[in-house]
């Protein structure tokens, strides 16, 4: 008689292996049907389009989950060094189509949905963007997660699950109005709550120094609930995890304070604790210094570090014996990348855990911390640097303040020993800034506490070394690196521009999707008549499609054979949307002056959000919409010039406008844009760039040849020279009649007849205190735009330059960026190993 199975033997039947994946169209249909009825509890008589979207999302998710589980099993067995990417922002956009693309499911799903009498594109449009970021910094984090999974790295993204992401922008009477982004209202099919890993985070309280060590007592506790989202690599069966924390009040929250019986009040007050993960702060490149924001920064750091240490100590969930208690090997198993200074508290928090909790001695703990952490700098604008008041730390994080003081003291002792008597250097390099309000300089803390510090484009990394962190570079030059940003070609070509991707695949195969340098193989085709025609045809189709979208969504009719001149990014003075406005007004004046002349027709599209408290940025939006109101309704102009403000610019709108663009505007003042990544997306999608020598534009010009971009304006050294000499806007105003005319029209109310003074603040700024020197680049910009017009009249020559740009965009893949981080900062090697899918036994 067969021996009865033990419980543990029986449990071996609980396996992902026996579960069928989506092999074909019939499987997709079956799974879709099952989810519609059993998961959503709907039939076809009552199902809404949103129900159909959710049924498809669950179908695709089923296919993903087996691979997700397999990947985690693989990491537990191999125990590789793990990469932790800490960011307060992950601007993911939509997930459905990206998941289908990366799993190779798009054709099967498309056909199955068609067979069911539905439209895949319509279902995709129902999904909310996950807008957990402001702009470039958050989108970079999302591209990096895609690349880390595609390169087979054991990587985790850690952030906050904001209940409300970046606000939705409405334009009302030409002004930006913010609306809350309730992106979770209908539920999120991609996330999985993990209450078993919920962790406590402490705030406030007091510090006690005892013979047994330091104790942080009488704290307020907030719980961090993790929500996991799968991040699939491209066709390699690797599925990594993005873990976002949500704040929960503990069950006894405030109840002890209300022993007089105000139970209801205590329960209502739970909201106060849970506000920590309520909303993303909508400031891009601006530091506000709010206590709730500091709480958010510590919340994500404290929860994440507990999680990292749990995973380091014990490889498997449910395994009761800690595998590792010695922290010597911690930096060999853990790399923490700080995405800007927002997660800077990782440094003092790791020190607190090592010294106070794990009883590691200070010097050893400091060595471990430095070897583990690395810091990416994203901005050189002084108003963006985080400088927290010491008084806020004293109250909120008293133990961390002590640790920061101790770190700073040792650091300054070291500097003083190397530069005796140089008191000014000590002041410049201190983490603590003295003054009326003592402040903690978080960037200095990051530089001191990390083994690697990187900028995000070559020119930016030079500015970081020569200016922002000059003293620190002199102290430890080997610490400073450059890692030029990149974008994922899966989302930013294959997903958003399938026509162009197919055209390229026909010529050079599919390898470029995971090795973008292969695009160089297109160079011999620059003069190929058929390829030129094919590329131009794809662009025209994209323009027609986007024109139809604009007509449907914005009720504006545009000329699809006009040049699509696109300027989309956060609205900020340094990005110089005002320079673009002056060009538009000048073009308008030229058409009015000589209506019979042949003009190259243009549709100028400007889009982006302004921080709600940034008066000048909001006024810039009003100016763009006001110029549009005049230009678009002038019968003399006709369809030769149109100005469109693209409302509520976000990832899903970028995916539509970028493939349709002819001209990409990247016109920040030289030395202000750290890198930019929009510039790379336009280049890859067949737009030509008009730009300054700033950020990654410099490297784009180097890769494609400066003659294949439209480069204009002051260089960094010219800007510095002008600063030394003193920038005088009036000189340009007096000597350039077209500039004077445009400024006078804005100033006099020509574009705002009902409110003649509407734009006085803009004109006053431009004339008297313009840090970003708009007038200084006006003449060069106008001349450069004339060259753009001239080339656009010759479609064949234009398309040749487009092909050359696409062929030379390989460097700007986030796969290349992440490979450099892996080898030069994290000390790991990318892997092309295919993890076996769930239906195949593991080795």
Swiss-Prot record:
Regulation: Activity of phosphorylase is controlled both by allosteric means (through the non-covalent binding of metabolites) and by covalent modification. Thus AMP allosterically activates, whereas ATP, ADP, and glucose-6-phosphate allosterically inhibit, phosphorylase B. Activated upon phosphorylation.
Binding locations of pyridoxal 5'-phosphate: 569
Record site: Involved in the association of subunits: 109, 143
Residue numbers marked as site, May be involved in allosteric control: 156
Leading EC class: transferase
Residues reported to bind AMP: 43, 197, 310
GO CC aspect terms: azurophil granule lumen; cytoplasm; extracellular exosome; extracellular region; membrane
PTM annotation, UniProt: Phosphorylated. Phosphorylation of Ser-15 converts phosphorylase B (unphosphorylated) to phosphorylase A.
Enzymatic reactions: [(1->4)-alpha-D-glucosyl](n) + phosphate = [(1->4)-alpha-D-glucosyl](n-1) + alpha-D-glucose 1-phosphate
Region (Pyridoxal 5'-phosphate): 677-678
UniProt-annotated site: Participates in a stacking interaction with the adenine ring of AMP, residues: 76
SUPFAM superfamilies assigned to the protein according to its UniProt record, in alphabetical order: UDP-Glycosyltransferase/glycogen phosphorylase
Cofactor(s) of this protein: pyridoxal 5'-phosphate
EC number of the protein: 2.4.1.1
Residue(s) carrying N6-(pyridoxal phosphate)lysine: 681
Keyword terms, alphabetized: Acetylation, Allosteric enzyme, Carbohydrate metabolism, Glycogen metabolism, Glycosyltransferase, Phosphoprotein, Pyridoxal phosphate, Transferase
Modified residue annotations for N-acetylalanine: 2
Residues found modified as Phosphotyrosine: 197, 473
GO BP term, pick one: glycogen catabolic process
Matching Pfam families: Phosphorylase
GO molecular function, one term: pyridoxal phosphate binding
Assembly mode: Homodimer. Dimers associate into a tetramer to form the enzymatically active phosphorylase A.
NCBIfam families attached to this UniProt entry: P_ylase
Sequence similarity: Belongs to the glycogen phosphorylase family.
Function: Glycogen phosphorylase that regulates glycogen mobilization. Phosphorylase is an important allosteric enzyme in carbohydrate metabolism. Enzymes from different sources differ in their regulatory mechanisms and in their natural substrates. However, all known phosphorylases share catalytic and structural properties.
Protein's UniProt name: Glycogen phosphorylase, brain form
Gene symbol of the encoding locus: PYGB
């Amino acid at each position: 008689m067969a021996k009865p199975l033990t419980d543990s033997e029986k449990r071996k039947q609980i396996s992902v292996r026996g579960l069928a994946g989506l092999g074909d169209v019939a499987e997709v249909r079956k799974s879709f049907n099952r989810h519609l009825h059993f998961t959503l509890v709907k039939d076809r008589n009552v199902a809404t389009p949103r129900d159909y979207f959710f049924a498809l999302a669950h179908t695709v998710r089923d296919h993903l989950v087996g691979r997700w589980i397999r990947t985690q099993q693989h990491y537990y067995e191999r125990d590789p060094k793990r990469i932790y990417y800490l960011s307060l922002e992950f601007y993911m956009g939509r997930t459905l189509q990206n998941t289908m693309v990366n799993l190779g499911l798009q054709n099967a799903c498309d056909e199955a949905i068609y067979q069911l009498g539905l439209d895949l594109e319509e279902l995709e449009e129902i999904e909310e963007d996950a807008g957990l970021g402001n702009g470039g910094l958050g989108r970079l984090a999302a591209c990096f997660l895609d690349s880390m999974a595609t390169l087979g790295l054991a990587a985790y993204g850690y952030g906050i699950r904001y209940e409300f992401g970046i606000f939705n922008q409405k334009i009302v009477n030409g002004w930006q109005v913010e609306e809350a982004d309730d992106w979770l209202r209908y539920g999120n099919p991609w996330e999985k709550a993990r209450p078993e890993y919920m962790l406590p985070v402490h705030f406030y309280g007091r510090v006690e120094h005892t013979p047994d060590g330091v104790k942080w007592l009488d704290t307020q506790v907030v719980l961090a609930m993790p929500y996991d989202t799968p991040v699939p690599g491209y066709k390699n069966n690797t599925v990594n995890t993005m873990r976002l924390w949500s704040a929960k009040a503990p069950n006894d929250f405030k109840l002890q304070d209300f022993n007089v019986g105000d139970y209801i009040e205590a329960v209502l007050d739970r909201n106060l604790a849970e506000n920590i993960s309520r909303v993303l702060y909508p400031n891009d490149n601006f530091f506000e210094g709010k206590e709730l924001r500091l709480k958010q920064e510590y919340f994500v750091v404290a929860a994440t570090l507990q999680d990292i240490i749990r995973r380091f100590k014990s490889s498997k969930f449910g395994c009761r014996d800690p595998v590792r208690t010695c922290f010597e090997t911690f930096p060999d198993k853990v790399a923490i990348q700080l995405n800007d200074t927002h997660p800077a508290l990782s440094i003092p928090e790791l020190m607190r855990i090592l010294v106070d909790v794990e009883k590691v001695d200070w010097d050893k703990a400091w060595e471990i911390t430095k070897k583990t952490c690395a810091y990416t700098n994203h901005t050189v604008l002084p108003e963006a640097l985080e400088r927290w008041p010491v008084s806020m730390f004293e109250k909120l994080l008293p133990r961390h303040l002590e640790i920061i003081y101790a770190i700073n003291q040792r650091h300054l002792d070291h500097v003083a020993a190397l530069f005796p008597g140089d008191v000014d250097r000590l002041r410049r390099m201190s983490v603590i800034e003295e003054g009326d309000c003592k402040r903690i300089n978080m960037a200095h803390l990051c530089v001191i506490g990390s083994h690697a510090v990187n900028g995000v484009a070559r020119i930016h990394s030079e500015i970081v070394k020569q200016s922002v962190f000059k003293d620190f570079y002199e102290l430890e030059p080997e610490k400073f690196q450059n890692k030029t940003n990149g974008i994922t070609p899966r989302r930013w070509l294959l997903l958003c521009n399938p026509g162009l991707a197919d055209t390229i695949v026909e010529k050079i195969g599919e390898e470029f999707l995971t090795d973008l340098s292969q695009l160089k193989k297109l160079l011999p085709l620059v003069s190929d008549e058929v390829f030129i025609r094919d590329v131009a045809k794809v662009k025209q189709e994209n323009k027609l499609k986007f024109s139809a979208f604009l007509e449907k969504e914005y009720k504006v009719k545009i000329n699809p054979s006009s040049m699509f001149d696109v300027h989309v990014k956060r609205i900020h003075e340094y990005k110089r949307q005002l320079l673009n406005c002056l060009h538009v007004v000048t073009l308008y004046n030229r058409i009015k002056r000589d209506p019979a002349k042949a003009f190259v027709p243009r549709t100028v599209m400007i889009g982006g959000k302004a921080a709600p408290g940034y008066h000048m940025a909001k006024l810039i939006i009003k100016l763009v919409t006001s110029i549009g109101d005049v230009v678009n309704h002038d019968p003399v102009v006709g369809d030769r010039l149109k100005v469109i403000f693209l409302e509520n610019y976000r990832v899903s709108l970028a995916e539509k406008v970028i493939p349709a663009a002819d001209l990409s505007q990247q016109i920040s003042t030289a030395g202000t844009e750290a890198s930019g990544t929009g510039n790379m997306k336009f280049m890859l999608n067949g737009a030509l760039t008009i730009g300054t020598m700033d950020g990654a534009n410099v490297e784009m010009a180097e890769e494609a040849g400066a003659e294949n971009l439209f480069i204009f304006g002051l260089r960094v050294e010219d800007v510095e020279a002008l600063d030394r000499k003193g920038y005088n806007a009036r000189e340009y105003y007096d000597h350039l009649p077209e500039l004077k005319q445009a400024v006078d029209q804005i100033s006099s109310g020509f574009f705002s007849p009902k409110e003649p003074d509407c734009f006085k603040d803009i004109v006053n700024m431009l004339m008297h205190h313009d840090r970003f020197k708009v007038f200084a680049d006006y003449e060069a910009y106008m001349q450069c735009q004339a060259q753009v017009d001239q080339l656009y009249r010759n479609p064949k020559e234009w398309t040749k330059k487009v092909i050359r740009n696409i062929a030379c965009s390989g460097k700007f893949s986030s796969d290349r960026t992440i490979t450099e981080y892996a080898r030069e900062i994290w000390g790991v090697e990318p892997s092309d190993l295919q993890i076996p899918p769930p239906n195949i036994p593991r080795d």
